[in-house]
Amino acid sequence: VVHSHLDAVDCHVMYQGKGYNGRPMEDIKAAGGCPKGNIDALKDGVVTRAILFDATLLPGKATAQGWVEPGTPVHREDLETLEKMEHVKVAPGDVILLYTGRWKRRAEKGPWGRDTGFAGYHGDVAYFLKERGVSFIGSDGPTDVMPSGFPASVGLPIHQLALAAMGIDIFDNLDFERAVEHARQLNRYEFLFSAAPLRIALGTGSPLNPLAIF
């Protein structure tokens, strides 16, 4: 199982058999991989400003142990609340990263399956992404809240809307424990973010080791 990874903008998740810019599944099958919009398009790496949204700061969201329980959604209005709490403002080109305490919970309680769920972004966050011009989105979990609250036919609403509809790449399963500790000490939730995926021709994604530089 791949831990921290970056999805390719095309081919990774599709909606009704089509990816970004309407690319049909048949094109991918014929190419034996992702012919365009693959992970190799980001071979020179990603360097941009990051905003770390600490969901445990939201009133009523976190447990006493310091994490957000699986299945808890973080909505668009929650991000707007966190902007005020953290004294930040998301701007075009930013990557937004959501801390739910997933790895802290795992360290204390052990692993759990997808059937238990994960905290993450609700589908209405897509409006926030579009309005703010966000370039990348990520989380310490699979990014989408699970269960999503949407019909099963939709699957992963944030993945489908961000990747297939808007061309916004997604970082999944990142470990923010050290970053969030530093952010709390400094009371600063923005930093320089750097990540370089592997050069995988036709690849639909890549493992990576991103860096937060305060």
Region annotations inferred by a language model:
Residues 1-214:
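Active-/binding-site microenvironments in catalytic and ligand-binding cores
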